[in-house]
């Protein structure tokens, strides 16, 4: 009798254990999840400071491989599979020059896993609390990586810490880069914007499948840095993304950022480079596409490095009009947004790649020459820029610091603030930040004058101090930096949950209203108002009005920064 009781009791214990496991998402070292395409098997990871593991699924396809006839075409649905698919190894990165990934590892003091490269690259990674399963309906945060639309990968970011600490589900994605992501013929044969179409395909996959991993398809926040932030800003403006996401975070990048707009003569030059390098006939778009689809990946990569003419285009579909037109019309979907910049966006990483000589100091003549070359400001107006920025600056280091600030203003701060104002005026909830902390890990590797450089905030957002896997994002973090990382993870996750970053034990983050309040993110968090208000006025009002009086707005050399930021009303007056 007692033996029967013991047997029954043990059986009951097993039933309760199994039931608990189901309730908690079947916590196992080899988690299995169903998708509409087939079953996947992931793995588990741990993070510092948390006992419960994170389920990790790597390399899940969200589109068919863009090979052969699918090169330079919209992404197609992924191919289903019948066996259990192992999702435990990193996918190939999209075709790019891997040299820059290796260089960035050293410059950024990070470590990436060993990654292959292929055009077969449309995959995503998922990081979820181990208990999450169908029915958990956790907020989803989809990260769109940056890299200047030329380099980058889903797998150089690890969402484990953010998922573990904040009970959110993290998705990191990949999209075609360089010429593979943006080649176009400006007609129906190859309208371009393939990279943005890939991002739409990833969002559609999330919409249809993320509930099986414990995510809520009705609570999707897209976030990204640099080119990823530009992509997010573009997705907000595009009518094709309607209903696919509900909140957005743009870290150091927006759609109206200068250098993204190319003119017809630049495209013609790019096509001529194609003709010269690939020996393809560019007079017939169909023939040209057939020729290019027969070229090797390396041949196309080499071609992309010889011309930068192929970038985002107004294709009548993803971009019905120029981004500034769409922004100023305020007909875009007004989702709650966080927009932010770092306080020295062009402090180190970007100059190291584009013009390293200026880091050692610059005189005013050299500085103005660089400004003229990079911004295409006509020589007769350079004295206006010099007076506004360099008045009273004499030492080489003072001029260098001012020049770096100018480039940061032009390419990041002013476009970000103009975008924030337009979102606010379209009745979209907006929160703005300036990240101000120089990471301690650069104490001995960066010049002392560098403050918070481009991308420095990312290691804090992803909980870099708490990662212990293949991706190393933040070695040598101080206790203050660990606390700042925890706070930033909480701000970002709170926003993903509700559209408001504020929460218990966090300094108040005011909305970006008519007072233009913003958060200063540093080890001691505080609030500011009207960030660089005079600089915004200079680039969007003072200088354009002076130039419009002399019809300089009609010149083909009109500076791209102003062309990107001017409201259509001023352009029409000038014409």
Curated annotation (Swiss-Prot):
Glycosylation, residue list: 281, 363, 515, 524
Active site: 226, 345, 454
InterPro entries in the cross-refs: AB_hydrolase_fold (IPR029058), CarbesteraseB (IPR002018), Carboxylesterase_B_AS (IPR019826), Carboxylesterase_B_CS (IPR019819), Type-B_Carboxylest/Lipase (IPR050309)
PTM summary: N-glycosylated.
Signal sequence coordinates: 1-28
Compartments, record wording: Secreted
Database matches in CDD domains: Esterase_lipase
PANTHER family: CARBOXYLESTERASE
Function: Involved in the detoxification of xenobiotics and in the activation of ester and amide prodrugs.
Protein name as annotated: Carboxylesterase 5A
Organism the protein comes from: Rattus norvegicus
Gene field: Ces5a
